[in-house]
């Protein structure tokens, strides 16, 4: 959560939070990882670009793509759709041509052993998220909580947002709560970045912001709650792929 974020004016990149907030209450994101056969990445990207341009344009079902640059899934693709109501997934109507094309892409390019990366559903939490910027990269951090610790940690995220607001810190991040697809005691912080330079430590630090907003006693109490509640966390850096993504509405 201590990444330095800078706003950018490059409109070619997708502003995720703009999509989410523009649609008001639809907050559900569905996503998965795709492990492409080695040497087939360029062909896969070309095929997905064609697929998205035909079936996932403005006014159609949105689809966005990133490529993972760090961790055990380096080189895999992160593909998702967001800004939905739950019932949208029941009511969506696809064509046989669309479904066959996506099946063709999967059969031709995706590794049969796809790393167990099944579909997951996440619920965007605007009350925990902070700021709004477009981004060419994201730092996707998942926090896996111990039993009965999730609510307490999300309460800390509320105060963390307030501390950032009081400090007027120049960061941008979205918070999602996991709803389905594996263990549910999980939330994610999706930090919006320009590049790796935004991973550098910030001033004031998280502790300094928190203490300034709530005092040392609250910081120490919440730090202990966070430490006790966190089972483990993992951060993946991803680059946005505009050609593999729906065009954002103005």
List each model region and its residues.
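Positively charged n-region of N-terminal signal peptides that target proteins for export
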Residues: 1-8
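Hydrophobic h-region of N-terminal signal peptides that target proteins for export
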Residues: 14-22
